[in-house]
């Protein structure tokens, strides 16, 4: 499904499979074309095989976002098995309700701008997002989780607050890991104004890369966040390198 300006779902059921589904493991050519820049996943498809996409308007060169491209889920049930991003938007994304089960060879949820999960004061069940397989699970420039339950399995970063065409990652493969938090790894140098904020809800991350990776700051104000990180040279929490910080004022981490 592709919308030029805005995609909104208020109810109903969607079951989507694109190209070879989440089992895709190589480059392909042809089709509708790509989109914005690469994200470090060298095994991703070169065609547009996203599950749901709100593109937005770009300049004539196709490189500078101008308006629109918002994706909003207020309710309903979404099941996606995609070779490219399962949910993707060029503008802002709001996952405020509904149930989403996503499997992908690339990003589970990707926003080129702000990504909001749940409502302020919302319950822990709304929305429900289960990313069973992904390269990176949740990606946006500014990520805020207010409520709901999010479960992520990723072969790179679980949550990634980065630019719209971020190029981090090593294309690792991995699943649920054993053991504790482990030490902080080296990884790629990063810095910026991107943010990742947890105000409520439940977050479960199983990542072979960094569990929670922000090129800017990470803030914990409430909710429950559980991270299992399995890949060498990475860490459960990773913020930017230029006067950025991880701050805790509430919740359980």
Question: Positions of the model-derived regions?
Answer:
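A composition-driven surface/loop motif
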Residues: 1-253
């Amino acid at each position: 499904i592709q919308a030029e300006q805005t995609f909104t779902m208020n109810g109903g059921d969607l079951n989507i499979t694109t190209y070879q589904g989440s089992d895709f493991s190589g480059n392909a050519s042809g089709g509708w074309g790509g989109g914005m820049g690469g994200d470090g996943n060298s095994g991703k498809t070169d065609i547009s095989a996203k599950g749901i996409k709100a593109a937005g308007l770009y300049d004539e060169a196709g490189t500078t976002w101008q308006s629109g491209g918002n994706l909003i889920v207020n309710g309903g049930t979404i099941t996606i098995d995609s070779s490219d991003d399962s949910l993707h938007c060029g503008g802002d994304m709001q996952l405020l309700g509904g149930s989403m089960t996503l499997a992908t060879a690339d990003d589970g949820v990707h926003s080129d701008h702000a990504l909001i999960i749940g409502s302020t004061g919302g319950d822990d069940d709304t929305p429900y997002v289960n990313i069973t397989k992904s390269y990176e699970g949740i990606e946006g420039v500014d990520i805020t989780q207010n409520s709901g339950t999010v479960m992520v399995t990723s072969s790179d970063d679980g949550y990634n607050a980065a630019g719209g065409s971020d190029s981090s990652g090593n294309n690792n493969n991995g699943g649920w890991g054993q053991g504790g938090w482990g030490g902080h790894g080296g990884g790629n140098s990063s810095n910026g104004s991107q943010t990742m904020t947890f105000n409520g809800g439940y977050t479960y991350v199983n990542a072979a890369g960094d569990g929670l990776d922000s090129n800017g700051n990470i803030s914990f104000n409430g909710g429950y966040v559980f991270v299992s990180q399995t890949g060498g040279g990475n860490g459960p929490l990773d913020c930017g390198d230029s006067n950025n910080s991880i701050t805790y004022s509430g919740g359980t981490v």
